[in-house]
């Protein structure tokens, strides 16, 4: 058995109530809270069960770059979790690093390409009013 005494799991509380109190986040799905988490500078440990979620390859690629741990099976997640604790905590204090924001821009904020606006502009060009 491993000793995870330095890990505290929050109960069932609203994410925004604890987002500024955490040193890192563990989540198990690519759902709405993930978009809030990628907007922070904090490490994210993400477990995406392949049996329940199918990510497009670009989302998977960007999440692998953004997350401190990205895994699609329990064993890989626990291995990544152990490595994270060894490398991101020094003398009981979390160590933060740079984060890759491409997932946030491409899947959250958009990269400047607005499909709805594009189709409206195309239609306006074609229908000369």
Q: Could you tell me what each predicted segment is?
A:
Residues 1-4, 24, 29-110:
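Catalytic binding pocket for nucleotide-activated donors in carbohydrate/polymer assembly enzymes
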Residues 15, 74-75, 116:
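Residues at or immediately preceding the N-termini of alpha-helices
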Residues 5-12:
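Active-site donor-binding acidic/aromatic loop of nucleotide-activated sugar
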Residues 108-129:
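C-terminal alpha-helical cap of glycosyltransferases
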